[in-house]
Amino acid sequence: MRQRDLKFTFVVGEGKLAFDVVEFELEEALCEPFRLNLKLASDKNAIDFRQVLDQPGTFTLWQDGRPARYVHGIVSHFTQGSSGFRRTRYELLLEPQLARLELCCNWRIFQEKSVPEILQALLKEHRVLDYEQRIYHEHLPREYCVQAGDSDHYLHDRLAFEEGLVYYFRFDEHRHTLVCSDRLYVQERIAGGPVLFSAQPEGDNPQPVLHSFRYSENVRTARQTQRDYSFKRPTYDQEHHLAGEALEHQGSSYERYDYPGRYKRSGAGRPFSESRLRGHRRDARVASVSGDDPRLIPGHAFALEGHPRADFNAWWRPVRVVHRGTQYAGQEEESADAPLGVSYDLRAELVPEDVEWRPAPLPRPRIDGPQIATVVGPAGEEIHCDEWGRVKVQFPWDREGRHDEFSTCWIRVAQNWAGADWGHMAIPRIGQEVIVDYLDGDCDQPIVTGRTYRATNRPPYALPDHKILSTIKSKEYKGSRANELRIDDTTAQISAALMSDHGASALHLGYLTHPRPEGGKPRGEGFELRTDEHGAVRAAKGLLLSTEEQLRAGAGHLDRGVVVQVLEAALKLARELGDYAGEHQGVGHDAAPQQTLQEAVRDLGHGANDESGKSNGGKPAIALSGPAGIAAATPASLTLAAGEHVDSVARQNQQVTAGQKVVINAGSDIGLFAQGGELRQITHQGPMLLQAQKNDIRLEAEQSVEVSASQQHVLVTAKEHITLMCGGAYLTLKGGNIELGMPGNFVVKAAKHSHVGPAHASTSFNAWDSTPFDDRYVLRDEATLEPLPNIAVEVIRGDGGVVKLMTDSQGRLPKQQHLAMDPVQIRILGKGSHNSDTESNT
């Protein structure tokens, strides 16, 4: 229609550059940047584009000489068209500052920020200072939110729509304000009273009205169900169900089930589901109108009056409006018949005011494939993880990260196994390159799935030189040593090794070599368990150490047939010889402990999976078996100890050799029994002592007993008496007397016979060169302990012999000698410090 009380104007900057408006079309909607397309005219035919492009501009719709509507924005497009006789045509696009966000895209990470906080930061970055947030509900922080190459505007809208935020614009002459809120119902209402409806033809209404009103209802999703997963609560499905509003005119069974719901906290699940459902039902009840009331603005509610259907006369909220206008005066040249007047109309989409309208959810960005990243952490640290083994990484695309513990959130790491307190664990270390994939392609759900070598992290062995080596090699935390499991697949030389640099400890299996990188010189075949530190082998149910052949593990791992046979034969031999010795006055043999041990070795594997049908064994015994022999050697000492018996059995010879002494001590009996051969005890250099300290010595022989001294003498002594008997004759030495008796003749043959006075054997020993027992006595003052020189004493020997002696200048007496221990009594005769008797037993 034509309305001569309307006028359109447009100025750029602060009113310094004005244009005549020829035509305009303004498209504006909730949650969309507006677009004002202007066709302009100016008497200037050479306008500097710098004065217009990317500059603020204000469009004003005047009604009755007063501004009825402002549209303020930034010039995004400017075109100079044809020039007429007096005027030049121009075209221009005016958009909000928010539209500039579409010009920028980025890769970056937001951590521990709520969506309102992210939007504020994003707009502040683009200097969108006229921004107002109206937040009525709690919005939980997002642990990790990524802008994955999409535009800043797409990020803004995606996050806002997910979180249930709507935005619209509020205008004045000098600015446009972006208003963002999580509740639509409480927002603005237009000024100036109700909007009128009139069904009269266009142009017949004296005031702005809506002359067309079409109301529709559409069958839409009735229920929204969403689920998501959190590894911290794996058994909780985080499922949320919501039913739509105003379902009276449609079925309620139309459910939309989405997974994942893109929320990790249950508290965010309901609002997320609610926003999505509202987006799906955004046009369930909608009205399409047309008219010429310029007050209709998206987001601003109005009351409708004058509609013939009473229930349509209610509060409505525009969600989309398209304004069009033509100002013929702005396009006039010099033609006298140019049309005059102004034309303006609008088309709009409305929803009831009480509807919490939300836009359709935007598709979430998807990462096309895995990405490379570097593990990071605090300075000076090598391993940085949390209780779940998660790590932090620095992506190559992240310009804001500082390669530290704040570069990302904690990111989960895929392991080969992950069980309940069991599985594989190898935490990626700081500086390692990792492969990061994304669950469901979601940029906000990274997961480390692998690791790769690179120039700064070389493989453990030079390649391809050592391509036959497979290894798991770790590095000492904050050190330079390593632990390693290495497999060598060299042809005909395969081996495996489990190694630790601590103590050079290792288990080598197979074809043993020195390290391949150092030449790989052979060093044996089989296995080697070695360390520079301590070692221990423990088996609680028994241990078999054997060199018995068992090719390719063809029998049970405790196959011990040979050692059991040898032990049984040894037990049999010990019993036979022991019993025979006992029957012939030898010391009795106790074979029970030996039999117990033999049975323990026999039953060593009973109860194991290959001997499960037999009685339980598993006694903690050790069996050593060497078909070719067992050698135990040490340059130091060898100790063999037993709490019960030590049974040593040899089917042939048992030989004991010592370079110096052989000492055998027994707490009870010692039995030596030679069943069929000799028993020899020989000292080659030193003396031989055969002594019974508390009892008797008996020498018995079925044949003869011979006693000889090839170089010196044979001495027989006794305290009580000595008796020699043979054939009824006897000789007895007793009490200093000699008695001879015989049933036959007494023959004495000698070259000379001498008869002298009495003598004692004890005193005669002092004249011997040496005897086994000798003593030197020193006489001392009892008080001062000083030696007493020149004191006469009387020494009384055990057999009654008496010797008078004198101490020398140092108080010493002459040496007293005997073949055995002998009691001695010393009596002081001369004057000295003490006259008391002193006795000494030796």
UniProtKB/Swiss-Prot annotation:
Similarity annotation: Belongs to the VgrG protein family.
Cellular-component GO terms for this entry: type VI protein secretion system complex
Start and end residues of each stretch annotated as Disordered: 265-291
Function noted in UniProt: Part of the H2 type VI secretion system (H2-T6SS) specialized secretion system, which delivers several virulence factors in both prokaryotic and eukaryotic cells during infection. May form the spike at the tip of the elongating tube formed by haemolysin co-regulated protein 2a/Hcp2a. In turn, may allow the delivery of the Tle4 antibacterial toxin to target cells where it exerts its toxicity. Also promotes the release of VgrG2b toxin to the host cell.
Knockout consequences: Deletion leads to a 75% loss of internalization of P.aeruginosa into host cell.
Tree of life domain: Bacteria
Protein name: Type VI secretion system spike protein VgrG2a
Pfam family, one: Phage_base_V
Record InterPro entries: Gp5/Vgr_OB, T6SS_Rhs_Vgr_dom, T6SS_RhsGE_Vgr_subset, T6SS_Vgr_RhsGE, T6SS_VgrG/RHS, Vgr_OB-fold_dom_sf, VgrG2_DUF2345
GO terms, biological process: protein secretion by the type VI secretion system
SUPFAM superfamilies: gp5 N-terminal domain-like, Phage fibre proteins, Phage tail proteins
